[in-house]
Structures are given as C-alpha cells and as structure tokens.
C-alpha cells in the first residue's frame, strides 16, 4: 500500500508509464540473496553488496570514489560531479548491521536498521522520539531510511540528530 502525499498533477501516471516501458519478463541471475554476484556496474556507477564489514572495508580500499549506502533515500539529493563515477557500497546485506538490540539499558542500532524497525524500542524507552520518527516522511521512507544515513548526510534539516544529542547518544564509526 502507498502512504503519504501523491502529486495531484501527475498522480500515478509516471509510475504506470515506467512499468509499461518494461518489455517482457525480468530475469535476475540465479544466485543466493547474499551472493557476490549481486554486484552491478553501469556506465555511470557501480554498486557493491558486501556480506560482511570486512568485505565492505576491502571494497572501499580497492575502489576510488566510494560512498556507503544503506537505505539510500537521499541518494538523488546528493550532487556528485558528472566526471566522477561513484562506487556505492550497499551495507544493507551485512547481517551484523541489520541488528537492533537492548543491552545494559542502552539501545544498539546497526547502520542498516530502518527507522520503522527502531519504533518498538523508542516507544519503550523514549516515546517522544518515537513520535518524531512516526512523523518522519511517509511509511515507505521510514521502511527504507536509516538513522545512520540521516546522520551521515549531515543535512541541516536532519530530523534525528537533535534528539539523539539530547538523549546522549554515541556513534561508533568504522572507516
């Protein structure tokens, strides 16, 4: 189901037109969900899907112009010079970064945990912050966007940083 605002001018027309442009069936390579064959390259960008933090490190050292992504909801907002071919390292297939858990009265949130998945924890420990998360974009955005991404984009309109600062949150960064 779709939620949020839909443009009154175009409605579903662009979505329907895009689907109609698909000619025939789409065949994906036969490989497991976590297989390296999921890596893809085009003339304008490369996408890598590591399955471990170590593999992500390795990819970042082997490739220039690397950018880490998980939800990727702000990808179209970023401005990358046309002369640069970005190498995106997608972190959302790394199991350890998709975990959220409570430990010693703290919430530990992996870089690929979606905003939607944080809600039960914030509702339990910080209900006002849960309310902020519920107002964050549409349900589609919350199901894709991550707190890590919201912090890493350093957007002046980032919704999570002020609350996390007030809560005394800390961030563990690897590079």
Over which residues does each language-model region extend?
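C-terminal structural segment of proteins
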Residues: 1-175
